Amino acid sequence: MINRRIRVRFAPSPTGPLHIGGVRTALYNYLFARQHGGDMILRIEDTDSNRFVPGAEAYIIEALEWLGIKFDEGVGYGGRFGPYRQSERRDIYRTYVRQLLDSGRAYIAFDTPEELEARRAEVPNFQYDATTRGQMRNSLTLPAEEVERLVAEGTQYVVRFLVEPNLDVEVNDLIRGRVVINSSILDDKVLYKSADDLPTYHLANIVDDHLMEVSHVIRGEEWLPSAPLHVLLYRAFGWEDTMPRFAHLALLLKPEGNGKLSKRDGDRLGFPVFPLEWKDPQTGDISKGYRESGYLPEAVVNFLALLGWNPGNDQDVMSMDELIRLFDIEKCSKAGAKFDYEKGRWFNHQYIQRKDNAELAELFRPILRENGVVATDEKTAHVISLVKERVNFIGELWEQAGFFFIAPLSYDEKTVKKRWKEDTAKQLGELAELLDSHRSFAAEATEPTVKNWIETNGYHLGNIMNATRLALVGESKGPHIFDIMEVLGREETVGRIRRAIEVLG
């Protein structure tokens, strides 16, 4: 392995929204690149035109930007190895298809889909390989003149890689160690289709990684069975000395651990599997995302980083900078990681507690607007400081703090029965008079005054406080009652108490 600059790529296909497993792959690439002072490339692998979904590429870019996963070059970023969309690299791929054909490492096949289907029906476990290619319609069995004629006439064909049998192909994986597979189990994979003049994933992947000087390929374990083919392609091109190192990440599993995590699991258990909300352009169906569900991007990043890797200590909460410093690709687990969505909620709660109140106020502002509330930044930040320990998601801020901005229109019946006693109206009337004449409304000023008044009059502290909370909030929730009064101010506090007396009697 020659010593060279670390360069990694995240290469999604625009076939739909980016799955949370793909986000983790992008994150691990990013952590590895940043740790080694290397480059992160965004490449869009859009060679499968049949599966292309409008809007998917823009979604992928927006999702990664939201999560703070940044690229040095690629689609939307530019760079000297472009273009970075595979559909824009046709001329490049044609050159390398021709190189393989000329060197005898690939061949042209004219078998139609119907003919191949017939063979599969005749022969169980049929595959196009060294044992069967001599029986098929291809440039290995047809005269050269006929091959030229068929191509000239526009007959559709594919180019297949000629896999030599009985070779031990070694893949040195950074996570799984040495993996050896005999080439006899591999089929002659299709590398190019004349129908759309585009390569398949395998050829485009190898050519692009080589030309873009990718040093490490970090991807999901679903690509591990393809790794021997990719090694053989590097050999066929004479690029084995500059072949990247591979690291195949274990799958994200269902919370129960039995199988790969899917959208269906999220729907069943009530958690997102996409970073952002996604609207299917064909059906109009909407799938919720982590952003719209009230998750902070830092929490999602921290949560995902620890699904399949840990720093070797008891530390859970880590910033992106800490993750970059501690991440070790070789310590990633070979076994799949159960998706613990409750742990994700826990991480979000931790990050909400740590986040600056002014920043949370910015995130809360759209929710205030939806509820017709206009409030100062100072008040909003103050309110958040009082309630954020009670919330797991941004959306829950309104549930916990809405009463600070809109007076209760009704009162919880159970709380009324429990807290509103015969003498409550009289006592709260006196409290309203006391508060209305109080000069300072800071909590540290009102609390001793009110408690002294309660003691002097022989009233029950708990009864007064509970009834006052009901008057101000409409139910029995909320932070310290004197903090609530301070935020509401004298006029609003007294007004709410007097309205409760009027309504509840």
From Swiss-Prot:
Top EC group: ligase
A single GO cellular-component term on record: cytosol
One Gene Ontology molecular-function label: glutamate-tRNA ligase activity
Top-rank lineage group of the source organism: Bacteria
Ligand binding (ATP): 263
Biological process terms in GO annotation: glutamyl-tRNA aminoacylation
A Pfam family assignment: Anticodon_2
Catalytic reaction annotation: tRNA(Glu) + L-glutamate + ATP = L-glutamyl-tRNA(Glu) + AMP + diphosphate
Keyword Amino-acid biosynthesis annotated: no
Residue positions of motif 'HIGH' region: 12-22
UniProt motif ('KMSKS' region) ranges: 260-264
Primary site of residence: cytoplasm
InterPro entries: aa-tRNA-synth_I_cd-bd, aa-tRNA-synth_I_codon-bd_sub2, aa-tRNA-synth_I_CS, aa_tRNA-synth_I_cd-bd_sf, Glu-tRNA-ligase_bac/mito, Glu/Gln-tRNA-synth, Glu/Gln-tRNA-synth_Ib_cat-dom, GluQ/Sye
Subcellular locations according to the entry: Cytoplasm
Keywords carried by this UniProt record: Aminoacyl-tRNA synthetase, ATP-binding, Cytoplasm, Ligase, Nucleotide-binding, Protein biosynthesis
Entry's transmembrane regions: none
EC number: 6.1.1.17
Stored HAMAP family: Glu_tRNA_synth_type1 (MF_00022)
Matching NCBIfam families: gltX_bact
Family: Belongs to the class-I aminoacyl-tRNA synthetase family. Glutamate--tRNA ligase type 1 subfamily.
Subunit field text: Monomer.
Function of the molecule: Catalyzes the attachment of glutamate to tRNA(Glu) in a two-step reaction: glutamate is first activated by ATP to form Glu-AMP and then transferred to the acceptor end of tRNA(Glu).
Protein name (record): Glutamate--tRNA ligase
